[in-house]
Amino acid sequence: MVNMKASMFLTFAGLVLLFVVCYASESEEKEFPKEMLSSIFAVDNDFKQEERDCAGYMRECKGKLCCSGYVCSSRWKWCVLPAPWRR
């Protein structure tokens, strides 16, 4: 009888411990995406604030030179990829 009470107590304690570990793991997983998104947007804002001396793809090139690998379209005045059919 005592052995059965001890095994029931250990089983119950194990289930409680399992519940606590799962709850802690789940709460950490809920915070992870929020932290990841906030860090991504923080990095994105740093790049937006950076001023460039050249114009990137599909940017207006009237007052600026296009970045390397792009040419200024004579028709649209945008920086585009160089191609044989573009003059």
From Swiss-Prot:
This protein's UniProt keywords: Disulfide bond, Ion channel impairing toxin, Knottin, Secreted, Signal, Toxin
Tissue specificity remark: Expressed by the venom gland.
Endpoints of the signal sequence: 1-24
GO CC terms of this entry: extracellular region
Official protein name in the record: U3-theraphotoxin-Hhn1l
Matching InterPro entries: Huwentoxin-1, Huwentoxin_CS1
Cysteine disulfide links: 54-67, 61-72, 66-79
PROSITE patterns recorded: HWTX_1 (PS60021)
Record propeptide residues: 25-52
Pfam families: Toxin_12
Keyword Ligase: no
Keyword field contains Ribonucleoprotein: no
Record remark: domains: The presence of a 'disulfide through disulfide knot' structurally defines this protein as a knottin.
Subcellular compartments: Secreted
Primary subcellular site in the record, as a coarse category: secreted
Annotated family: Belongs to the neurotoxin 10 (Hwtx-1) family. 51 (Hntx-8) subfamily. Hntx-8 sub-subfamily.
Molecular function, one GO term: toxin activity
